[in-house]
Amino acid sequence: MSDTLPALRATLTELVAMDTTSFRPNVPLIDYAQARLEAAGFSAERQKFLDDAGVEKVNLVAVKGGSGSGRAALALVGHSDCVPYDAAWTDALRLTEKDGRLYARGACDTKGFIACALHAALNAEQLKAPLMVVLTADEEVGLTGAKKLVEAGLGRARHAIVGEPTRLIPVRANKGYCLAEVEVRGKEGHSAYPDSGASAIFRAGRFLQRLEHLALTVLREDLDEGFQPPFTTVNVGVIQGGKAKNVIPGACRFVVEWRPIPGQPPERVSQLLETIRQELVRDEPAFEAQIRVVRTDRGVNTRADAEVVRFLAEASGNAPETVSFGTEAPQMTELGAEAVVFGPGDIRVAHQTGEYVPVEDLVRCEAVLARAVAHFCGGR
């Protein structure tokens, strides 16, 4: 299929063999990438941090023709971590090929892109403008690594191609991703004597009823027709409460997830949650609920006529689209880039047992990234 395929396959084989599940260190992969990039003339800067469990994580910013603190012409951005895999998938860390597909955990999300980015960077010569390769940690558990880069001002570029499995379709906009945990309190008692307690589950039901009403009305007033659906969505995917069938529940907890359209403050739903709480307290002074906002990651909407959008559309042959899942593009935008999400594979097979990337996607992606390097950095 291509002279580049054997080398791409070899690199991807090495990348997937390193278990970079988010709860593990990603240091081996960073060491591997840094060694190869430095051997090709890149200068590398590492940003170390500990995750909530005290596990060491590392972001890598490698530049050819500049420094990590400066602004590159183009950044190729990929996250090094993967979601966990089922123990029954015994070949999860061994790249296997069948019917034109390369199978392994991370092959699609996003080590396939990293392999392509590394090869496009390693083969770049005579650069006239700085090229940057950015590898982040802990994207799968809150975009933590990308947020650390923003805090430190590392990874600045004029244009950024953020790796995700988009089927080689340029994605110029994505919704944000936000989470809040709500705990509603009641009073335990014997279920045979309702007046002896106050049901936290019934109280939570009243809270959720109001939330659903707002999700179906107020949050559908702001529209962005570039998305499907074109409004901010709300979901309550987890709820827990009660101890036994004959005990009035004293507590009920649920998790609210919302995906704001770009331009809408990500805090809007958390403000609505607080409004609901206050209204319920007004109606029932004994009502008690605590709201803990966990994440408020905004979306991004890169201009349709931005140079990087137009280039990727032409180079890939695919019209730009939008997606409703979160990416690291907003963080790259905060660092000053016009960012587009792009990469081999399909998000619908990511995070699954039997995750794969099509061989053809891998080869085409590397070719597009190589063209991007030549276009934005003037190399060959």
Swiss-Prot record:
CC annotations in GO: cytoplasm
Pfam family, one: M20_dimer
Entry EC no(s): 3.5.1.16
Enzyme class: hydrolase
Entry's localization field: Cytoplasm
Cofactor(s) needed: Zn(2+); Co(2+); glutathione
Chemical reaction(s) catalysed: N(2)-acetyl-L-ornithine + H2O = L-ornithine + acetate
Gene Ontology molecular function: acetylornithine deacetylase activity; metal ion binding
GO BP terms, alphabetized: L-arginine biosynthetic process
HAMAP family: ArgE (MF_01108)
Protein task: Catalyzes the hydrolysis of the amide bond of N(2)-acetylated L-amino acids. Cleaves the acetyl group from N-acetyl-L-ornithine to form L-ornithine, an intermediate in L-arginine biosynthesis pathway, and a branchpoint in the synthesis of polyamines.
Subunit structure, as described in the record: Homodimer.
Database matches in NCBIfam families: AcOrn-deacetyl (TIGR01892)
Protein name: Acetylornithine deacetylase
Organism: Myxococcus xanthus
